[in-house]
Each structure stands twice: as C-alpha cells, then as structure tokens.
UniProtKB/Swiss-Prot annotation:
InterPro entries: P/V_Pprotein_paramyxoviral. Keywords: Phosphoprotein, Viral RNA replication. The gene is P/V. Signal peptide: none annotated. This is Phosphoprotein. Belongs to the rubulavirus/avulavirus P protein family. Residues 28-115, 129-149 are annotated as: Disordered. It comes from the Viruses. Residues 45-55 have a biased composition (Basic and acidic residues). The keyword Isomerase does not apply.
Length: 399
C-alpha cells in the first residue's frame, strides 16, 4: 500500500501550520495583521527586503507555536471537517490522535518571515526540495512494494518528520498506540499503563474496510422507552395466545356444526314427507255431513228405520218407558246394568280425577294461599261435576 502526499495535501498542511503560527504570534503580541490579497510580486519583494532585518523577537515567536501546536491542530481540524484528497485519503484527521513521532534526519528550518505569505512560500519550498526516501514494505498478501509511510501524532514540540517502514513501526514500544488509520497494526503484548481514560490501546482488525464512509441511515435510533416497548410486545404475545386458543376451540366445533347441518337436512326431508301424507288424509268430523245444504239441515226429523246388528232380539232391552239404554259404544244395554256399573266404578274415577287436578293446580300456582284453598275444595268434592267446575275456575283465574 502506497501513501503519496500530493501538492494539495502539502498546501493544506502548510496552511494549517501557518494558522497555528499566526495564532501563537498573536497570543505573544509579536506580529501584526498581514495585508489581505497581496500580489505574489509584492510578497517576493517583501521577503527579499526582510531577509537582513529579521530580529531575535521573530525567531522566538517562530519557536513558540511548536509548544502550542497540539490544541491548535485540533482547532483547525475541527474547522475543516470536510476536506479530503482526491484519492479518498486525507492527512488531516477529524479527530485528535495520540502517539509518538519517529524522528528522521534533521532539516534546517529557516527563520520565519515577517509576513504571512512569506511563511507560506518558505514552507512550500522546504516541502518540495526535501528528498524522499523509498523503502520496501510487505502487504498482507506477502507482496513487497516500494512505498513510503508518513507517521503523524505523538510529540509535536519538535519540527521533525519520519519515514519508517511497517516492520520498524511494529517494533516500537510505546504507552500510546493509535489505530494507524487504514494500515495494519500487528498488536502489542504490553499492558496499558492507564487503566482509565478516553483512549486505550486498540488492536486493529486485519480486514481492511473497502470504504471509510458510513451510511447514517443504517445506524439504529436511540430507544428512549425500551421497557415500554417490551411491555407492549409481551401484552401482544398474551393476546395472540388467547386468540390462538379460541381459534383452536372453533376448529374443534367445526365437526359438530357439520353434523348439525346434516341432521337439519334429514329433519327437513322427514317433515316434507309428513306434510305430503297429511295432504292425502281427510279429517272427518262426526255428526257434520260434508255436502249438506242449510235447507236440509233445517228440515224436521224424519222417521227412519234403525238396524241393530249382532244383538238379536232387542225387546228385552226396552224398559217400562219404551226406551232403550245404550252404552258409550251405542250398544243396547239394560238400564239396571248401567246403574250398577256406574256405582261400582264411580269412586275410582273420582279419586283419579282428584289426583290429576291437584297436581295441575300445584304446577300452576305453586305453594301459595290460593293453591291451598283450591286443594281443600278438591278434597271436599264428591262428584265429578264438582271437580270439573273447580278445574275450570282455576284455569280461568290464570287467564
């Protein structure tokens, strides 16, 4: 992997250093505001005229920014967060870095000019004329490439730069190790000296990220009410369990519903059959002829012959009043026989009728005063007519 510093990046570094110098000189009161928008010709003339008139005050002022460069670097880096080089790698970091600066060969730093533009020209010339060392590094695939690596951070009090290889950097024993930006760091077995603090020793991953950009929309939002969300989810789970139980019960009753439908269809078929049979029946009302006019009904009774079959001679059934007594089946009987039969069975019929009417009254009225009075009157009745009259009065009182 090769890190080459372009001219634009050098300009940015020089401009950052000049801003730090201006700030330090302004704090020391050893400089004045440079005239804005001076042409390049005037800058060169001013630089030539001031070569012989530099004082020790300016020399001391030029050394002062080296001690105050750490806070100024952070200030300038924060003021320029969006600057990046064309190849996606910027030497200006947007965050503070800690580490040790490995020193190379000392370069003679010229005394600063009195003007702002003069300092810029001196720094550009010094950066362009300084020779670069080509060194060999080995990447993660085992291939050897000629490249140079620039190490930033650490003690910035001295104005020195270092070009070191990957193997030399891995052998350094330091209490402060940065993450080496996008290069590999093989790790350190040394325990951190500070157990607490903002930055500890961090081991870099062996996998190089394809890009340094981060999609902001992929970052999850902060959950202010995580407990309430969990409670809501648990409540939904309970409701879902209840719904599933009810659905299971409904599925179990599905067979019963289908069986009920089949029974209903059978009942409908049977009812249709019964209705068809009823239409074929003719209900006859005895004593009421079907085709008789009103005139024929209003006629007086006529003498008609009566044929009695199966009994033989009926003269023995004729009583003294010249009448014949018939039983419920219209059979002629002796009048004395009927009376004897009625007297023998009258008590059994009355007792059965009393029991029937008493149970009916208890079901209708329950245990109340009216029910007791009706039961007493039934017990005191001796004939069927009395019991029937009590029954009729009880039914009328309900309606």
């Amino acid at each position: 992997m090769s890190f080459e510093i372009s001219v634009e990046e050098i300009d940015e570094l020089i401009e950052t250093g000049n801003l730090n110098i201006d700030y330090a000189l302004k704090e020391l009161g050893a400089t004045s505001q440079p005239p804005p928008n001076r042409p390049l010709s005037q800058i060169s003339k001013t630089e030539e005229n001031n070569d012989e008139t530099r004082t020790s005050k300016n020399s001391a002022s030029a050394e002062a920014p080296a001690h105050a460069s750490s806070p100024l670097r952070s200030h300038n880096e924060e003021s320029e967060p969006g600057k990046q080089s064309s190849d996606g790698f910027s030497m200006i970091s947007n965050r503070p870095q800690t580490g040790m600066l490995l020193m190379g060969s000392d370069t003679q730093s010229p005394s600063p000019s009195k003007t702002y533009q003069g300092l810029i020209l001196d720094a550009k010339k010094r950066a362009l004329n300084e020779p670069r060392r080509n060194q060999k590094t080995t990447n993660e695939h085992g291939n050897t490439n000629d490249t140079w690596i620039f190490k930033r951070g650490g003690n910035i009090a001295t104005k020195k730069e270092a070009w070191v290889t990957q193997n030399q950097r891995s052998k350094i024993q330091s209490s402060f190790q940065d993450i080496e930006e996008s290069t590999r760091f093989h790790g350190s077995m040394e325990e951190p000296q500070y157990q607490s603090g903002a930055i500890h020793v961090a081991h870099q991953s062996n996998q190089l990220p394809p890009s340094k950009n981060v999609h902001v929309e992929d970052v999850p939002k902060f959950a202010n009410y995580a407990l309430e969300i969990l409670d809501a989810i648990k409540a939904l789970e309970v409701r879902l369990d209840r719904i599933e139980g009810k659905v299971d019960k409904i599925m179990l009753t599905q067979n019963t519903i289908q069986q009920t439908k089949n029974d209903t269809q059978q009942i409908k078929g049977s009812l249709a059959t019964i209705e068809g049979l009823i239409t074929t029946m003719k209900i006859m009302d005895p004593g009421v002829p079907s085709k008789v006019s009103l005139r024929s009904l209003n006629k007086g009774p006529e003498q008609v012959p009566i044929i009695v079959t199966g009994t033989g001679d009926v003269s023995k059934f004729v009583d003294q009043d010249n009448t014949i007594t018939l039983d419920p089946l219209a059979r002629p009987i002796l009048s004395g026989t009927k009376q004897i039969t009625d007297e023998r069975r009258a008590g059994v019929r009355i007792d059965a009728l009393k029991i029937t009417v008493s149970e009916m009254i208890r079901d209708l009225f329950g245990d109340c005063d009216k029910s007791r009075k009706l039961l007493e009157s039934i017990n005191m009745a001796t004939t069927e007519q009395d019991i029937n009259s009590i029954k009729t009065n009880a039914l009328r009182s309900i309606t």
